[in-house]
Amino acid sequence: MELWQQMIRDSVHTTDHLVDKFGIDREEAERLNEFFQVRINPYYLGLIREKGDPIYRQCVPDIQELQDFDANDDPLMEDAMSPVPNITHRYPDRALFLTTSQCGLYCRFCTRKRKVGNSEKISMKGLEAAFNYLEQHTEIRDVILSGGDPLMLTDAMLEKILKRLRQIPHIEIIRLGSKMPCVLPQRITPKLVEMLKRYHPIYVNTHFNHPWEITEESAKACQMLADAGCPVGNQMVLMKGVNDDPHVVRDLMQKLLKIRVRPYYIYMADQTKGANHFRTSIAKGLEIIEHLRGWTSGLAVPHFVIDAPGGGGKIPLLPNYVMHWDEEKIVLRNFRHKIYTYKNVAEEQPATTVSRKKQIDRRRAIVRRLTTTTAPLPNKKVAAFAEA
Protein backbone atom coordinates (compact mmCIF):
# COMPACT_ATOMS: atom_id res chain seq x y z
CA MET A 1 0.00 0.00 0.00
CA GLU A 2 1.33 3.43 -0.95
CA LEU A 3 1.53 6.29 1.56
CA TRP A 4 -1.36 8.21 0.02
CA GLN A 5 -3.60 5.15 0.22
CA GLN A 6 -2.78 4.69 3.89
CA MET A 7 -3.60 8.35 4.50
CA ILE A 8 -7.02 7.81 2.91
CA ARG A 9 -7.59 4.92 5.31
CA ASP A 10 -6.56 7.09 8.25
CA SER A 11 -8.98 9.89 7.34
CA VAL A 12 -11.62 11.41 9.61
CA HIS A 13 -14.77 9.77 8.25
CA THR A 14 -17.12 8.65 11.04
CA THR A 15 -19.59 10.29 13.38
CA ASP A 16 -17.33 9.40 16.31
CA HIS A 17 -14.45 11.19 14.60
CA LEU A 18 -16.55 14.34 14.16
CA VAL A 19 -17.57 14.30 17.81
CA ASP A 20 -14.07 13.61 19.12
CA LYS A 21 -12.05 15.84 16.77
CA PHE A 22 -14.34 18.83 16.40
CA GLY A 23 -16.77 18.68 19.32
CA ILE A 24 -19.81 18.51 17.05
CA ASP A 25 -23.03 17.45 18.77
CA ARG A 26 -23.52 13.73 18.14
CA GLU A 27 -27.04 14.04 16.76
CA GLU A 28 -25.96 16.82 14.40
CA ALA A 29 -22.86 14.84 13.39
CA GLU A 30 -25.00 11.83 12.48
CA ARG A 31 -27.36 13.95 10.38
CA LEU A 32 -24.51 15.75 8.63
CA ASN A 33 -22.59 12.57 7.86
CA GLU A 34 -25.75 10.99 6.51
CA PHE A 35 -26.45 14.03 4.32
CA PHE A 36 -22.94 14.07 2.82
CA GLN A 37 -20.25 11.84 4.19
CA VAL A 38 -17.04 13.20 5.64
CA ARG A 39 -13.50 12.46 4.56
CA ILE A 40 -10.63 14.57 5.88
CA ASN A 41 -7.23 13.00 5.32
CA PRO A 42 -4.42 13.55 7.88
CA TYR A 43 -2.47 15.88 5.59
CA TYR A 44 -5.34 18.31 5.03
CA LEU A 45 -6.46 18.01 8.65
CA GLY A 46 -3.01 19.26 9.62
CA LEU A 47 -3.54 22.50 7.68
CA ILE A 48 -6.37 23.63 10.00
CA ARG A 49 -5.13 26.37 12.33
CA GLU A 50 -8.29 27.06 14.30
CA LYS A 51 -11.98 26.28 14.32
CA GLY A 52 -13.82 28.08 11.54
CA ASP A 53 -10.74 29.08 9.56
CA PRO A 54 -10.70 28.83 5.72
CA ILE A 55 -9.37 25.26 5.73
CA TYR A 56 -11.81 24.12 8.42
CA ARG A 57 -14.79 25.56 6.56
CA GLN A 58 -13.97 23.64 3.39
CA CYS A 59 -13.83 20.19 4.98
CA VAL A 60 -15.65 20.13 8.35
CA PRO A 61 -19.45 19.80 8.13
CA ASP A 62 -21.63 22.69 9.30
CA ILE A 63 -25.23 22.55 10.49
CA GLN A 64 -26.05 25.16 7.83
CA GLU A 65 -25.74 22.38 5.24
CA LEU A 66 -29.06 21.01 6.48
CA GLN A 67 -30.92 24.30 6.05
CA ASP A 68 -31.34 24.44 2.27
CA PHE A 69 -32.90 21.16 1.21
CA ASP A 70 -34.95 23.02 -1.40
CA ALA A 71 -31.77 23.63 -3.43
CA ASN A 72 -30.99 21.48 -6.45
CA ASP A 73 -28.72 18.45 -6.08
CA ASP A 74 -27.75 18.72 -9.78
CA PRO A 75 -27.78 22.47 -10.48
CA LEU A 76 -25.69 22.16 -13.66
CA MET A 77 -27.99 19.52 -15.18
CA GLU A 78 -25.07 17.17 -15.72
CA ASP A 79 -27.27 14.07 -15.54
CA ALA A 80 -29.68 15.45 -18.13
CA MET A 81 -26.73 15.99 -20.48
CA SER A 82 -25.38 12.48 -19.95
CA PRO A 83 -26.06 10.42 -23.09
CA VAL A 84 -24.46 7.31 -21.54
CA PRO A 85 -23.30 6.54 -17.99
CA ASN A 86 -20.18 8.45 -16.88
CA ILE A 87 -20.25 10.96 -19.78
CA THR A 88 -21.54 14.53 -19.75
CA HIS A 89 -21.51 16.12 -23.21
CA ARG A 90 -22.36 19.81 -22.87
CA TYR A 91 -19.91 21.58 -25.18
CA PRO A 92 -19.43 20.91 -28.91
CA ASP A 93 -15.89 19.50 -28.94
CA ARG A 94 -15.28 18.22 -25.42
CA ALA A 95 -16.76 15.82 -22.92
CA LEU A 96 -16.61 15.19 -19.18
CA PHE A 97 -15.70 11.61 -18.27
CA LEU A 98 -16.51 10.56 -14.68
CA THR A 99 -14.05 7.80 -13.77
CA THR A 100 -14.67 7.36 -10.04
CA SER A 101 -16.91 8.60 -7.24
CA GLN A 102 -14.09 8.77 -4.67
CA CYS A 103 -12.05 11.80 -3.57
CA GLY A 104 -9.05 12.33 -1.32
CA LEU A 105 -11.10 14.93 0.57
CA TYR A 106 -14.84 15.48 0.51
CA CYS A 107 -15.32 19.23 0.07
CA ARG A 108 -18.40 20.54 1.85
CA PHE A 109 -19.25 22.77 -1.15
CA CYS A 110 -19.19 19.87 -3.64
CA THR A 111 -21.59 20.24 -6.56
CA ARG A 112 -21.69 16.46 -7.14
CA LYS A 113 -22.80 15.35 -3.68
CA ARG A 114 -25.36 13.11 -5.39
CA LYS A 115 -22.52 11.00 -6.84
CA VAL A 116 -19.42 11.51 -4.72
CA GLY A 117 -18.67 8.88 -2.09
CA ASN A 118 -20.59 6.08 -3.77
CA SER A 119 -18.83 2.87 -2.73
CA GLU A 120 -19.56 1.09 -6.02
CA LYS A 121 -16.31 0.47 -7.88
CA ILE A 122 -16.03 1.39 -11.55
CA SER A 123 -14.39 -1.20 -13.83
CA MET A 124 -13.11 -0.95 -17.40
CA LYS A 125 -16.08 -3.08 -18.40
CA GLY A 126 -18.38 -0.61 -16.68
CA LEU A 127 -16.80 2.23 -18.67
CA GLU A 128 -17.25 0.51 -22.04
CA ALA A 129 -20.37 2.50 -22.97
CA ALA A 130 -18.45 5.72 -22.28
CA PHE A 131 -15.53 4.67 -24.48
CA ASN A 132 -17.93 3.64 -27.25
CA TYR A 133 -19.66 7.02 -27.10
CA LEU A 134 -16.33 8.85 -27.35
CA GLU A 135 -15.29 6.68 -30.30
CA GLN A 136 -18.52 7.36 -32.17
CA HIS A 137 -18.52 11.13 -31.64
CA THR A 138 -15.65 12.33 -33.77
CA GLU A 139 -16.35 15.97 -32.91
CA ILE A 140 -14.95 15.36 -29.40
CA ARG A 141 -11.29 16.33 -29.33
CA ASP A 142 -10.86 17.12 -25.61
CA VAL A 143 -11.78 14.78 -22.73
CA ILE A 144 -11.76 15.85 -19.07
CA LEU A 145 -11.33 12.98 -16.60
CA SER A 146 -13.15 13.85 -13.41
CA GLY A 147 -15.27 12.18 -10.76
CA GLY A 148 -14.79 12.15 -7.86
CA ASP A 149 -11.08 12.49 -8.46
CA PRO A 150 -9.38 10.43 -11.19
CA LEU A 151 -6.17 10.35 -9.14
CA MET A 152 -8.01 8.21 -6.60
CA LEU A 153 -7.57 5.45 -9.17
CA THR A 154 -4.47 3.29 -8.96
CA ASP A 155 -1.73 4.05 -11.46
CA ALA A 156 -2.59 0.82 -13.28
CA MET A 157 -6.30 1.63 -13.62
CA LEU A 158 -5.63 5.22 -14.66
CA GLU A 159 -3.18 4.02 -17.29
CA LYS A 160 -5.75 1.62 -18.74
CA ILE A 161 -8.13 4.55 -19.21
CA LEU A 162 -5.46 6.80 -20.72
CA LYS A 163 -4.26 4.06 -23.07
CA ARG A 164 -7.78 3.41 -24.28
CA LEU A 165 -8.40 7.12 -24.88
CA ARG A 166 -5.16 7.41 -26.85
CA GLN A 167 -6.45 4.71 -29.19
CA ILE A 168 -9.22 7.10 -30.30
CA PRO A 169 -7.66 9.18 -33.13
CA HIS A 170 -9.82 12.30 -32.80
CA ILE A 171 -9.13 12.78 -29.06
CA GLU A 172 -6.28 15.27 -29.02
CA ILE A 173 -6.30 16.57 -25.45
CA ILE A 174 -6.74 14.74 -22.14
CA ARG A 175 -7.30 16.72 -18.96
CA LEU A 176 -7.22 15.47 -15.39
CA GLY A 177 -9.48 17.36 -12.99
CA SER A 178 -7.86 16.57 -9.65
CA LYS A 179 -7.67 18.21 -6.27
CA MET A 180 -4.94 15.82 -5.13
CA PRO A 181 -2.02 18.25 -5.69
CA CYS A 182 -3.74 20.53 -3.16
CA VAL A 183 -5.44 18.21 -0.64
CA LEU A 184 -3.25 15.09 -0.76
CA PRO A 185 -0.02 15.93 -2.61
CA GLN A 186 1.52 12.62 -1.53
CA ARG A 187 -0.48 11.11 -4.40
CA ILE A 188 1.83 12.75 -6.94
CA THR A 189 4.67 10.24 -7.11
CA PRO A 190 7.61 9.69 -9.48
CA LYS A 191 5.90 6.52 -10.71
CA LEU A 192 2.67 8.41 -11.50
CA VAL A 193 4.31 11.23 -13.44
CA GLU A 194 6.49 8.82 -15.42
CA MET A 195 3.32 7.03 -16.49
CA LEU A 196 1.58 10.29 -17.45
CA LYS A 197 4.49 11.20 -19.73
CA ARG A 198 3.54 8.33 -22.02
CA TYR A 199 0.16 9.84 -22.88
CA HIS A 200 0.82 13.49 -23.69
CA PRO A 201 -0.61 16.01 -24.19
CA ILE A 202 -2.07 15.82 -20.69
CA TYR A 203 -3.18 18.89 -18.75
CA VAL A 204 -4.03 19.00 -15.05
CA ASN A 205 -6.63 21.31 -13.52
CA THR A 206 -6.40 21.48 -9.75
CA HIS A 207 -8.29 23.40 -7.07
CA PHE A 208 -6.42 25.60 -4.60
CA ASN A 209 -8.85 27.92 -2.81
CA HIS A 210 -6.66 29.59 -0.18
CA PRO A 211 -2.96 30.52 0.20
CA TRP A 212 -2.60 28.25 3.26
CA GLU A 213 -3.04 25.28 0.94
CA ILE A 214 0.26 26.09 -0.74
CA THR A 215 2.82 24.13 1.29
CA GLU A 216 6.18 22.52 0.61
CA GLU A 217 4.36 19.29 -0.19
CA SER A 218 1.81 20.79 -2.57
CA ALA A 219 4.48 22.92 -4.27
CA LYS A 220 6.58 19.79 -4.84
CA ALA A 221 3.58 17.93 -6.29
CA CYS A 222 2.87 20.73 -8.77
CA GLN A 223 6.55 20.96 -9.70
CA MET A 224 6.65 17.21 -10.42
CA LEU A 225 3.65 17.48 -12.73
CA ALA A 226 5.10 20.51 -14.52
CA ASP A 227 8.50 18.83 -14.88
CA ALA A 228 6.73 15.82 -16.43
CA GLY A 229 5.29 18.11 -19.11
CA CYS A 230 1.79 18.42 -17.63
CA PRO A 231 0.73 22.09 -17.55
CA VAL A 232 -1.18 22.76 -14.32
CA GLY A 233 -4.09 25.22 -14.09
CA ASN A 234 -6.09 26.25 -11.05
CA GLN A 235 -9.85 26.55 -10.62
CA MET A 236 -10.78 28.47 -7.47
CA VAL A 237 -14.30 28.52 -6.07
CA LEU A 238 -15.28 31.87 -4.54
CA MET A 239 -16.62 31.16 -1.04
CA LYS A 240 -17.78 33.24 1.88
CA GLY A 241 -15.43 32.92 4.83
CA VAL A 242 -12.78 31.19 2.73
CA ASN A 243 -11.50 33.53 0.04
CA ASP A 244 -14.02 36.37 -0.38
CA ASP A 245 -11.27 38.94 0.14
CA PRO A 246 -9.39 40.60 -2.74
CA HIS A 247 -6.09 40.55 -0.84
CA VAL A 248 -6.39 36.84 -0.09
CA VAL A 249 -7.15 36.03 -3.73
CA ARG A 250 -4.29 38.16 -5.05
CA ASP A 251 -1.93 36.44 -2.61
CA LEU A 252 -3.18 33.04 -3.77
CA MET A 253 -2.83 33.82 -7.48
CA GLN A 254 0.70 35.18 -7.09
CA LYS A 255 1.79 32.19 -5.01
CA LEU A 256 0.30 29.77 -7.53
CA LEU A 257 2.46 31.24 -10.28
CA LYS A 258 5.53 30.72 -8.10
CA ILE A 259 4.78 26.97 -7.93
CA ARG A 260 4.17 26.85 -11.72
CA VAL A 261 0.39 26.72 -11.56
CA ARG A 262 -1.52 29.06 -13.90
CA PRO A 263 -4.70 30.64 -12.48
CA TYR A 264 -7.44 29.49 -14.86
CA TYR A 265 -10.91 30.08 -13.40
CA ILE A 266 -12.62 31.71 -10.44
CA TYR A 267 -16.07 30.16 -10.11
CA MET A 268 -19.08 31.60 -8.40
CA ALA A 269 -20.21 28.90 -5.96
CA ASP A 270 -22.85 26.67 -7.52
CA GLN A 271 -26.43 26.78 -6.23
CA THR A 272 -26.12 23.23 -4.95
CA LYS A 273 -27.90 21.57 -2.06
CA GLY A 274 -26.11 22.02 1.25
CA ALA A 275 -23.72 24.71 0.05
CA ASN A 276 -25.68 27.96 -0.13
CA HIS A 277 -23.98 29.31 3.01
CA PHE A 278 -20.78 29.51 0.94
CA ARG A 279 -22.28 31.77 -1.72
CA THR A 280 -21.22 35.40 -2.09
CA SER A 281 -22.67 38.22 -4.16
CA ILE A 282 -21.65 38.54 -7.80
CA ALA A 283 -20.46 42.04 -6.94
CA LYS A 284 -17.86 40.50 -4.61
CA GLY A 285 -16.46 38.45 -7.48
CA LEU A 286 -16.26 41.49 -9.75
CA GLU A 287 -14.55 43.44 -6.97
CA ILE A 288 -11.91 40.72 -6.73
CA ILE A 289 -11.28 40.78 -10.49
CA GLU A 290 -10.98 44.59 -10.33
CA HIS A 291 -8.38 44.10 -7.60
CA LEU A 292 -6.36 41.78 -9.85
CA ARG A 293 -6.57 43.19 -13.36
CA GLY A 294 -3.92 45.84 -13.89
CA TRP A 295 -2.67 45.61 -10.31
CA THR A 296 -0.78 42.35 -10.83
CA SER A 297 0.57 40.29 -13.70
CA GLY A 298 -1.92 39.24 -16.33
CA LEU A 299 -0.70 35.69 -15.72
CA ALA A 300 -2.29 35.95 -12.27
CA VAL A 301 -5.73 36.99 -13.56
CA PRO A 302 -8.08 34.05 -14.13
CA HIS A 303 -11.44 34.06 -15.89
CA PHE A 304 -14.31 34.84 -13.52
CA VAL A 305 -17.29 32.68 -14.48
CA ILE A 306 -20.70 31.48 -13.45
CA ASP A 307 -21.41 27.86 -14.36
CA ALA A 308 -24.96 28.64 -15.36
CA PRO A 309 -27.78 26.83 -13.53
CA GLY A 310 -29.74 24.56 -15.82
CA GLY A 311 -26.73 23.48 -17.86
CA GLY A 312 -25.91 26.73 -19.64
CA GLY A 313 -22.19 26.22 -19.22
CA LYS A 314 -19.51 28.64 -18.08
CA ILE A 315 -20.39 32.28 -18.68
CA PRO A 316 -17.59 34.84 -18.16
CA LEU A 317 -18.11 38.03 -16.17
CA LEU A 318 -15.95 41.15 -16.28
CA PRO A 319 -16.09 44.56 -14.67
CA ASN A 320 -17.41 47.07 -17.19
CA TYR A 321 -14.43 48.73 -18.86
CA VAL A 322 -16.41 50.02 -21.88
CA MET A 323 -17.98 53.41 -21.11
CA HIS A 324 -19.31 54.15 -24.61
CA TRP A 325 -19.11 52.61 -28.05
CA ASP A 326 -20.24 53.80 -31.45
CA GLU A 327 -19.20 53.56 -35.10
CA GLU A 328 -16.44 56.15 -34.70
CA LYS A 329 -14.85 55.31 -31.36
CA ILE A 330 -14.87 53.33 -28.18
CA VAL A 331 -14.49 55.06 -24.80
CA LEU A 332 -12.77 52.94 -22.17
CA ARG A 333 -11.62 53.15 -18.59
CA ASN A 334 -8.49 51.47 -17.27
CA PHE A 335 -7.83 49.81 -13.91
CA ARG A 336 -7.17 53.24 -12.35
CA HIS A 337 -10.54 54.49 -13.67
CA LYS A 338 -8.88 56.88 -16.12
CA ILE A 339 -10.78 57.43 -19.37
CA TYR A 340 -9.31 56.77 -22.83
CA THR A 341 -10.70 56.94 -26.36
CA TYR A 342 -9.76 54.55 -29.14
CA LYS A 343 -10.77 55.49 -32.70
CA ASN A 344 -12.73 52.89 -34.58
CA VAL A 345 -11.87 51.85 -38.14
CA ALA A 346 -14.53 52.08 -40.81
CA GLU A 347 -15.74 48.72 -42.01
CA GLU A 348 -14.88 47.66 -45.52
CA GLN A 349 -17.70 48.12 -47.97
CA PRO A 350 -19.54 44.81 -48.28
CA ALA A 351 -19.68 43.03 -51.62
CA THR A 352 -22.46 44.23 -53.89
CA THR A 353 -24.03 40.79 -53.74
CA VAL A 354 -24.82 41.33 -50.07
CA SER A 355 -28.26 42.84 -49.72
CA ARG A 356 -28.93 46.02 -47.78
CA LYS A 357 -31.10 44.02 -45.38
CA LYS A 358 -28.24 41.61 -44.63
CA GLN A 359 -25.88 44.52 -43.97
CA ILE A 360 -28.32 45.97 -41.45
CA ASP A 361 -28.90 42.56 -39.85
CA ARG A 362 -25.16 42.08 -39.40
CA ARG A 363 -24.75 45.49 -37.80
CA ARG A 364 -27.69 44.83 -35.49
CA ALA A 365 -26.09 41.54 -34.44
CA ILE A 366 -22.86 43.38 -33.58
CA VAL A 367 -24.77 45.92 -31.54
CA ARG A 368 -26.65 43.18 -29.67
CA ARG A 369 -23.43 41.38 -28.82
CA LEU A 370 -21.64 44.45 -27.58
CA THR A 371 -24.52 45.96 -25.65
CA THR A 372 -25.25 42.73 -23.80
CA THR A 373 -21.64 42.34 -22.66
CA THR A 374 -20.59 45.96 -22.12
CA ALA A 375 -22.11 49.30 -21.23
CA PRO A 376 -25.38 49.91 -23.09
CA LEU A 377 -25.28 52.38 -25.96
CA PRO A 378 -27.72 55.30 -26.12
CA ASN A 379 -30.72 54.25 -28.20
CA LYS A 380 -30.10 56.89 -30.88
CA LYS A 381 -26.52 55.74 -31.36
CA VAL A 382 -27.64 52.11 -31.64
CA ALA A 383 -30.25 52.94 -34.25
CA ALA A 384 -27.89 55.15 -36.24
CA PHE A 385 -25.19 52.49 -36.38
CA ALA A 386 -27.56 49.65 -37.23
CA GLU A 387 -29.23 51.53 -40.07
CA ALA A 388 -26.06 53.19 -41.45
PLM segments and residue spans:
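Conserved, mostly hydrophobic/aromatic
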Residues: 44, 107, 264
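Short cysteine/histidine-rich metal-coordination sites, predominantly Zn2+-binding motifs
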Residues: 121-129
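Flexible, acidic/Gly-rich N-terminal and inter-domain linker regions that tether
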Residues: 1-90, 371, 377, 382-385
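Mobile, glycine- and charge-enriched loop segments
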Residues: 109, 138, 219-244, 335-388
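N-terminal pre-triad scaffold of radical SAM enzymes
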Residues: 37-40, 83-111
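Iron-sulfur (Fe-S) cluster-binding segments and ferredoxin-like electron-carrier domains
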Residues: 110-122
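Conserved AdoMet/S-adenosylmethionine-binding subsite of the radical SAM
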Residues: 128-142, 151-298
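C-terminal accessory regions of radical SAM enzymes
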Residues: 31, 289-374
